[in-house]
Regions:
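Conserved SAM-binding loop
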Residues: 8, 81, 99-102, 134, ...
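Asp-based, Mg2+/Mn2+-dependent phosphohydrolase catalytic module
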Residues: 90-93, 106-217
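Active-site neighborhood of HAD-like aspartate-dependent phosphohydrolases
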Residues: 1-36
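Short, acidic loop-to-helix structural element flanking the phosphoryl-transfer center
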Residues: 73-101, 107, 111
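Conserved donor sugar-nucleotide recognition element shared by glycan-biosynthetic enzymes
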Residues: 15, 43, 81, 138
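Hydrophobic patch in the ABC ATPase nucleotide-binding domain
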Residues: 28, 56, 119
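A metal-dependent, Asp-based hydrolase signature
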Residues: 40-73, 83, 90-93
């Protein structure tokens, strides 16, 4: 299973830009500390944090919609895949391995991103953060994905880039490979393996991560 933001697509800088624009409209400033808290959680939780942090007198739903619109515009202008990510997705698909995408992003942005990259058909299942009760770091999205794919959790491997996502995968009892493209390697220590980028990843390494995790278990 793949996360999307920071794994399939190089979107973390775009999320930062969207949030900067969102706050600038309210004469508020954005900080790296906010990014660290919000990275990897679903839209409602991220916006709820912003509203509480800045004591905004606005509804979560309205701000989520505004944030999504800003992000959609940035996707249409600047969206690009992470280096070597699509090659791995295609390799997994060609090997006839059941493949899911489980993203904290809302469905409209997931559909937009995958459609623009023309990779929707490479996934057997696509789940977004607004389709489960609790977002990452809760295990809900990965457990739901495994159930819908018909795969037991111990036979699942998750590829993540954020501490919240790694925590969700491990809470679901799954193996986890972390890509340190968006987060310092030291913050991803709960993963079974950490690599710097997809140029280090192939099917053999994925199988090795699964074996190592089972050996430790």
């Amino acid at each position: 299973m793949f996360d999307m933001d920071g794994v399939i697509i190089d979107s973390e800088p775009l999320w930062s830009k969207a949030e900067q624009q969102l706050l600038a409209r309210r004469n508020l400033s954005y900080s790296p500390q906010l990014k660290a808290v919000m990275m990897g959680i679903n839209s409602s939780e991220a916006v709820g944090f912003l509203i509480k942090h800045y004591n905004l007198q606005e509804s979560v739903g309205d701000v989520v919609e505004e944030r999504n619109q800003l992000m959609a515009g940035l996707f249409r202008q600047f969206l690009r895949p992470m280096p070597h990510a699509l090659q791995l997705v295609r390799s997994v698909h060609a090997a006839e391995i059941k493949t899911g995408l489980a993203s904290s992003s809302p469905k409209e942005l997931v559909d937009l991103a995958l459609g623009r990259l023309n990779i929707t058909g490479l996934f057997d299942l696509i789940l977004s953060g607004d389709q489960v009760a609790r977002g990452k770091p809760a295990a809900d999205i990965y457990l739901t994905a495994a159930r819908e794919l018909g795969v037991s959790h111990e036979n699942c491997l998750v590829i993540e880039d954020a501490p919240h996502g790694v925590a969700a995968a491990k809470a679901a009892g799954m193996c986890c490979l972390a890509i340190s493209t968006s987060t310092n390697e030291s913050e991803l220590g709960a993963a079974d393996r950490v690599v710097r980028g997809f140029d280090e990843v192939d099917l053999a390494l994925l199988q090795d991560v699964m074996r190592c995790s089972r050996d430790r278990g």
